[in-house]
Amino acid sequence: MTFLQAINSALMRGLEHPKTLVLGQLVKYGLGGLTAGVFDRFPQQVITYPVCENLMHSSAMGLALAGYRPVVINERMDFLALAMDSLTNHIPVWPQRQAMKLPITVVAVVGKGKGQGAQHSKNFTPWFKMLDGWTVHEPHTPEQAYEMMLYDLTVSDKPVLYVAHREFFGKTVSVKLPNPKRVGLCGASSRHEATFYSNPDF
């Protein structure tokens, strides 16, 4: 099983609960495999949005408050910048102020890879690690990708940023994850590397 297939499998498993919803732009069309088959199996649990990131994430908060478990798919992390009012001033703050559960999973793809360009390859993960109220899950192996996603969709009752590195999508064996020391264009910030191992039979 590849990294991408692991995410998709966990997503399918989570959607077996009728209160779990998938939100995002073009999510019904598969997004290169990330949401493949989701609309075919769970058409009533898929909400497709126009290009309006702040609307997507603020409505996800409303759905969570209404008892749903929304999963917001962002094909590129770069455009989370357009939703920062929701992502900084409301979603992480509400559970702390109101002592309420807010089970929102924000999936953000870091688009490093050939042909991605400067506006489709940034990694804002450090921002969210500095914000109170967010749990950040950044899987490195197919096993972690599956287990973290399934946990977020079935157990967690808090806002989670789930970071999916596009360069991992086809991987089933040892891979290297570049860890930027500061936010910047992929390849433009100083970084160190660590090797993470996965079971090739997974």
Features from the language model and the residues they span:
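Acidic, proline/serine/threonine- and glycine-rich low-complexity intrinsically disordered segments
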Residues: 188-190
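Short, acidic loop-beta-alpha module within alpha/beta folds
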Residues: 193-202
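Thiamine diphosphate
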Residues: 1-183, 193
